[in-house]
Design a protein with these regions (language model features):
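N-terminal basic, Ser/Thr-rich segments that initiate or prime the first beta/alpha elements at protein or domain
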Residues: 1-458
């Protein structure tokens, strides 16, 4: 059993966390424009950086990994005391190999191992050379005669989202430019006519443009996130074997996920207004503490055969409306309160600060859409038993989650307030291996009792 060194990128997380330690004093000196102190700060930062590099070199020297003849992965740490962690392939619920662009340029891969039943914080993440990461993955979770599929729905869905975001961000940018041009020149005599405090005069001058630029920045960041998602869906491939299901893809960065089918906690089909429009449905799979941010695959309407081949045990919740009699109105609180506040501010700004009205309409419409989603959840969220499977539907923002439970080891927790007990309703929380929780709100108590009876008999 030969011990090997980790990739030097292992210390990137340590260096990133300590970056503020030696940059904060430098920024303070630059703002003060004290050039004498700047040279002193640069020398101090250089010494501190050398010290951190020495610590990083020590971390790399005392840490190593190995793979023995029986296929057990060992991670070693020797600094005063010896710590070893060992994982067999049978102990894993899933593994992921992530290679962002910077990692690809350095020939590195981030290998994350998800033990069965372990929470997200107890996963094992190591940075290895590309060939070593692939060898460890093939040893722990080998692919035996995989059946490959290349669904094209994910790329088009991501491209559709990206195009819509680009148009909306462009509109926000144009609005921000117009608001900036409309900012009046700073004339104390003019602003003195406004019989309010200095803070109110400052808000009257800068708030419309500042709010518009803030919305434009939020749209740009969302676009960057969608661009990253689109880049990861290029050349996307899904496979399944007798005991695994997984996917890989990416353009600038590569991502690979392998999931043991016997350890899948639940599968989630997320329905959004955009998904309904394009008729492409993303499917997410959770196994243990592994909940990838990317869908396992995206299928189009008419390609249900591929869905059934990849996840033959999945059962979609029935297309029924939930019982809404005596249901709690708490569904509307998270979106209704900010919607009412934004609507009130919009009405007030129409008379007090008209330049801000158009900008305030954007968050008002946004929270209005969330309120419409809450209304859909009020009518659709519920629990059903279907063909020997527990299925549920829950609303989160604009997404309607259609979930089928796979894993038998699930904890059901029913919580009732006095008001809910009086009307025969309760909140049900499902806790899966890895401490992943799903909550269904204000469901009839008899439906929850059916779930409990099903768990006792199965």
């Amino acid at each position: 059993m030969n011990e090997r060194r980790l990739h030097p990128f292992t210390v990137l997380r340590f260096l990133r966390k300590t970056l503020v330690v030696y940059l904060l004093p430098l920024v303070q000196v630059l703002f003060e424009r004290n050039w004498t102190a700047l040279h002193t700060a640069l020398r101090q930062d250089a010494l501190l950086f050398l010290l951190l590099c020495t610590v990083s070199w020590g971390i790399l020297r005392v840490s190593s990994w190995s793979l023995d003849d029986t296929g057990v992965f060992h991670l070693h740490w020797r600094l005063g005391i010896r710590l070893d962690r060992a994982l067999r392939g049978e102990m894993l619920a899933a593994l992921t190999i992530d290679r962002p662009l910077l990692y690809r340029m350095a020939g590195a891969s981030r290998l994350t191992l998800y033990p069965v039943g372990a929470a997200q914080k107890h996963t094992l993440s190591v940075c290895l050379p590309k060939a070593d990461a692939e060898a460890v993955a093939d040893q722990l979770m080998p692919l035996v005669k995989p059946a490959l599929h290349r669904p094209a729905g994910g790329e088009r869905a991501a491209l559709g989202f990206l195009g819509a975001n680009g148009l909306s961000t462009l509109a926000l940018f144009v609005l921000a430019v117009r608001q900036t041009r409309d900012v009046p020149d700073w004339n104390p005599a003019v602003f003195a006519q406004i019989q309010v405090s200095f803070l109110a005069r400052f808000a009257a001058r800068w708030l419309p443009a500042g709010a518009a630029w803030l919305l434009a920045a939020a749209g740009f960041l969302l676009g960057a996130s969608l661009m990253r998602s689109f880049a990861q869906t290029v050349h996307y491939t899904v496979w399944h074997t007798a005991d695994q299901i997984g996917s890989r893809g990416g353009w600038l960065g590569h991502f690979e996920c392998r999931v043991r089918t016997s350890e899948i906690s639940f599968a989630d089909v997320r329905i959004s207004p955009a998904a309904r429009l394009m008729k492409r449905w993303p499917v997410f799979v959770t196994a243990g503490g592994c909940s990838p941010e990317l869908p396992l695959f995206v299928y189009r309407s008419g390609e249900e055969a591929l869905f059934r081949e990849l996840l033959p045990e999945f059962r979609m919740p029935p297309d029924l409306l939930a019982r809404t009699e005596q249901r709690s109105l708490i569904f509307f609180a998270p979106a209704g309160i900010p919607f009412a506040l934004c609507l009130l501010l919009t009405l007030v700004s129409a008379t007090v600060l008209p330049q801000l009205t158009v900008t305030l309409l954007i968050p008002t419409f946004f929270f209005g859409a969330l309120l419409a989603g809450a209304a859909a959840g009020y009518r659709r969220e519920g629990l059903w038993l279907r063909e020997g499977r527990m299925t549920l539907r829950r609303q989160q923002g604009l997404y309607l989650h259609c979930i089928c439970v796979f894993h038998p080891d699930v904890c059901l927790t029913a919580a009732q307030s006095p008001w809910a007990a009086s009307v025969g309703r309760t909140n049900l929380t499902l806790t899966f291996p890895g401490w992943v929780k799903l909550k269904v709100r204000s469901v009839p108590l008899r439906d929850v009792e059916n779930f409990f009876s099903f768990m006792e008999t199965n």
